[in-house]
UniProtKB/Swiss-Prot annotation:
Residues binding ATP: G38, H39, S40, G41, A42, G43, K44, S45
Source organism (scientific name): Xanthomonas oryzae pv. oryzae (strain MAFF 311018)
Gene this protein is translated from: metN
GO MF annotations, alphabetized: ABC-type D-methionine transporter activity; ATP binding; ATP hydrolysis activity
Listed PANTHER family: AMINO ACID IMPORT ATP-BINDING PROTEIN (PTHR43166), METHIONINE IMPORT ATP-BINDING PROTEIN METN (PTHR43166:SF30)
The protein's role, per its UniProt record: Part of the ABC transporter complex MetNIQ involved in methionine import. Responsible for energy coupling to the transport system.
Assembly information from the UniProt record: The complex is composed of two ATP-binding proteins (MetN), two transmembrane proteins (MetI) and a solute-binding protein (MetQ).
Location in the cell: Cell inner membrane
Annotated EC: 7.4.2.11
Topological category with respect to the lipid bilayer: Peripheral membrane protein
Identification of the protein by name: Methionine import ATP-binding protein MetN
PROSITE patterns linked: ABC_TRANSPORTER_1, ABC_TRANSPORTER_2, METN
SMART domains: AAA, NIL
Length: 335
């Protein structure tokens, strides 16, 4: 478990104190994929770099298991960092080394015997699907392949925690999806705790179990991704969700003005996403409906659907009760 206890970070610039991260309390469970999302300058990179003390905290405590990371001396810090792997936005590969040489590098630094290094490198390149590229150099690789090398290198010392600092923001959508799929597979098969920072809610939706939302150095919302994504509370979170769903709130409200009736948002979760609930309830209650917006997608492995519909006529009270009885979440947008 990773636990932040009133951890905070400030800088002194020209005699002024700049707060990068306000005091926060947060727990990340063992084996979970935890997302940290925020706009540029929100403090997310500072937060993740406090975990392995690439940034020194200004106050508070950070516990990994029972160990107080903030109290470690240099020897303890070196031991900690061998248990924490990290991948970066711009890969940070050594251009003069081959793919295999990059993956071997952290093992060489700790004096691992050559035979063990060779076996470990072969195992890791097979895991990330780069066996055929072992003797190529970074300049010969695509962006996605470079990030896979970065992942293999981060796993070389057998870490318990993997930190991902904007690991997909330099990649195209298709490559992003493949890298996220690889991270999910690593989490399942190795049981690693993965802490992933991003400015894209779609990345959080695809791979994370829980999420923390940062805004101007403050933790403004946290919880299971399903709950935060479907029921965002803070204005920053709502903006991230709207961007991920490609919703234009102003345009949507113009659509509201063009139709009559009660407007509701219906949220379907799990297998109920694929049931013909709307049509059945419309027939049973005599309610007419006009679909203004809709989507079906997944939050990690869980299917979900959302419809914004205008309801007119019929027994709308019975229709609402029918939706609730069917496990559909109903939110009134206009009564």
């Amino acid at each position: 478990m990773i636990e932040f206890q009133r951890l905070h970070k400030s800088y002194s610039v020209d005699g002024r104190q700049i707060v990068a991260l306000h005091p926060l309390d947060l727990r990340i469970g063992p084996g979970e994929v935890f997302g940290i999302i925020g706009h540029s300058g929100a403090g997310k990179s500072t937060l993740i770099r406090l975990i392995n003390r690439l940034e020194e905290p200004s106050g508070g405590r950070l516990l990994i298991g029972d160990e107080d990371v903030t109290a470690l001396d240099s020897q303890g810090l070196r031991a900690l960092r061998r248990r924490i792997g990290m991948i970066f936005q711009h890969f940070n590969l050594l251009s003069s080394r081959t793919v295999a040489g990059n993956v071997a590098f952290p093992l060489e630094l700790v004096g691992t015997p050559r035979a063990e290094i060779d076996a470990r490198v072969a195992e890791l390149l097979a895991r990330v699907g780069l066996q055929e590229q072992a003797n190529q150099y970074p300049a010969q690789l695509s962006g996605g392949q470079k990030q896979r090398v970065g992942i293999a290198r981060a796993l070389a010392t057998g870490p318990q925690i993997l930190l991902c600092d904007e690991a997909t923001s330099a990649l195209d959508p298709q490559t992003t999806a493949s890298v996220l799929q690889l991270l999910a597979q690593i989490n399942r098969e190795l049981g690693l705790t993965i802490v992933l920072i991003t400015h894209e809610m779609d990345v959080i939706r695809r791979v994370c179990d829980r999420v923390a939302v940062l805004d101007a150095g403050k933790l403004v919302e946290t919880g299971p991704v399903t709950e935060v994504f479907l029921h965002p509370k803070h204005v920053t979170t709502r903006r991230f969700v709207s961007e991920a769903e490609h919703l234009d709130e102003a345009e949507l409200h113009r659509d509201f003005a063009a139709v009559g009736g009660r407007i509701v948002r219906l949220t379907f979760l799990g297998n109920g996403t694929y049931e013909p609930v709307l049509g059945r309830i419309a027939r049973d209650t005599g309610v007419d409906y006009n679909i203004l917006s809709g989507r079906v997608d997944r939050i990690k492995d869980t299917p979900y659907g959302q419809l914004i519909v205008a309801l007119t006529g019929g027994d709308q009270t019975a229709a609402r009760a029918g939706f609730v009885a069917a496990g559909v979440q109903v939110e009134d947008l206009r009564v």
